[in-house]
Structures are given as structure tokens and as C-alpha cells.
Regions:
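Glycine/threonine-rich flexible loop motifs
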Residues: 124-133
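Short, Asp-centered acidic motifs that coordinate Mg2+ and/or phosphate
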Residues: 115
Length: 278
């Protein structure tokens, strides 16, 4: 169980205004895809205290698997939870990308945040999971507008996961990236094994894999004639012998860091498609 204290209950009123952002103090925007009351988010907030002005804008409820989607079909509401002068917490009824877009639009008119952080996710976002991840969708949104962005994920899906050992790792990486911003368009996908003492940190590439038999069909019974599909599935590693991937290092109890880019161009395969223009 997380040792981080709970955030205040849902507010009875909404409200927000311009927030003071001192020029000599780092400004950090924080979001997630598990919702503003998730233990991983609370742990990340506590890990960051003292590093600068922290603006949290997170979904009002879990939005796992929303990737880089945003809301265009309905209005989005923004509500203030608390602001103690160091950490301001808001939630909205949108996706993680909505949270980033709204926060940038509403709170960062005069200056961009120095850093966007997403997480700490309850569950891993290694290999192909990065494609579906709302945690990493928020990171890529930050990359698109030229802001150094990091996604943190713990390989533990439990809502009661213990983030005690993750907090110092997240703080250390945050401090280092504040001092050495990432190149434009590049974010970091950080996955942490669920062990008390990870063996170290490795910069690596994303593993090549996919999910098989993702949906299980459940037939209706005498209590309910409704049938449905339940998300499930088995991860298939296309390169189980590879020793330079995030999946490999996580299985060996190392923290994996994959530099991730919004540019999905397959540069190595340009010549392979010359026949299309001849």
C-alpha cells in the first residue's frame, strides 16, 4: 500500500485562475492516466516537492489506454482540488492529453513549463504498450510542443501498489532532466520493476512485441442474456533473445529508460519503397 497521504476529497465547487510562476523557479506540469486520486500520482507529487512550482492537471477518473486521444465531442470541465502555494491540483473530465492541452492553455501563457511529467502509472508501459498508453500519450503531447517530458510507470497494476522505492528514482531522473533538457521532440519512457531495490538504470530500445488473444468472449447466462468481450491477452515477445530492450532489462530488475520520439517515420526503409515513384 502506498505510504503517500490521500488528496482532499472532490471539491464542491470549481474554480481556477492565473497562477504565479516565478521566473527563477522551475515550473513542472504533472498528469497521469489513472486519475487524480491515484496512489502513483500522489507519490510523484510528494517526490517532486521542493523542486519548483508544481501544477497538477489529471483526469477525474481512470483513462488507461486512451493513448494520445483528446476530446472534441463535448465540453470539458476543470476543477480545483487544492493549492498550497507549492502544488496546485486540478482535475478535468477529459483524457491525459486534454489535461496537458488545457493546462498549457490556461496556466502557461507567459512561459512554458520546464518539464512535463506523467505517472507514476499503475502498470508497465514497456514495448508495444507505449502505443496504447495514456501516460505516454501525455508525454508525446509535451514533446510535440517542444517541452521535455517524462513518463514514469511501475510494473504493478494494483491500485494499492507501494511506490516507496519509486519516489527517489523519479526525483533523481527529474532533477537530471531539469538540468539537462531532452532534445526537442524527444521524451523519456521510464519503467521501474516492482522490486524493493532495482539493480540499476539502463538506456535501451523498445522491445518488439504484441498482444495476442486480447479479447475474451463471455456468453450470457440465465441471469443475464447479454454477452460481451473482456480485455485480456498474452504478451508475445518477437525477440526473446535480445539483450538490449526494455523488456529484457525489466525482467532482470533494472529500470529501463527508452528515449521516445513523436516522429514515426521509418527512415531505414525509404529505399525499399522507391518502386512506388517509378
Amino acid at each position: 500500500m502506498s505510504n503517500a497521504p490521500k488528496l482532499p476529497p472532490r471539491p464542491v465547487a470549481s474554480g481556477f485562475g492565473q497562477l504565479p510562476l516565478e521566473a527563477d523557479r522551475p515550473a513542472i506540469l504533472v498528469t497521469n492516466d489513472d486519475g487524480y486520486e491515484a496512489g502513483g500520482l500522489i507519490a510523484l507529487i510528494n517526490a517532486l516537492r521542493g523542486l519548483g512550482r508544481i501544477i497538477v492537471c489529471a483526469p477525474d477518473s481512470p483513462r488507461s489506454g486512451y493513448s494520445a486521444s483528446f476530446t472534441s465531442s463535448r465540453p470539458i470541465n476543470l476543477s480545483l482540488v487544492s493549492d498550497d502555494g507549492e502544488v496546485a491540483v486540478y482535475f478535468c473530465n477529459g483524457t491525459p492529453v486534454d489535461c496537458v492541452k488545457i493546462a498549457l492553455h490556461r496556466f502557461f501563457h507567459e512561459r512554458k513549463p520546464d518539464l512535463i511529467l506523467s505517472g507514476i502509472n499503475h502498470g508497465g508501459n514497456d514495448s508495444v504498450c507505449v502505443m496504447y498508453s495514456g501516460t505516454m500519450g501525455a508525454v508525446l503531447e509535451g514533446c510535440a510542443v517542444g517541452i521535455s517530458s517524462i513518463g514514469f510507470s511501475l510494473l504493478n497494476l494494483s491500485p494499492m501498489a507501494d511506490f516507496t522505492h519509486v519516489m527517489p528514482i523519479a526525483r533523481r531522473i527529474t532533477e537530471q532532466v531539469l538540468a539537462n533538457p531532452t532534445p526537442r521532440g524527444v521524451g523519456l519512457n521510464v519503467n521501474i520493476p516492482d522490486v524493493a531495490e532495482p539493480k540499476g538504470i539502463r538506456i535501451c530500445r523498445q522491445a518488439d512485441g504484441y498482444w495476442e488473444s486480447e479479447y475474451h468472449y463471455i456468453e450470457g447466462d440465465e441471469q443475464s442474456d447479454m454477452s460481451w468481450f473482456q480485455v485480456t491477452g498474452t504478451y508475445i515477445n518477437n525477440e526473446p533473445e535480445a539483450t538490449d530492450t526494455d523488456r529484457y532489462w525489466l525482467e532482470h530488475d533494472y529500470v529501463s529508460i527508452v528515449p521516445t520520439t513523436i516522429d514515426q517515420t521509418a527512415y531505414r526503409h525509404f529505399e525499399q519503397f522507391d518502386y512506388l515513384v517509378k
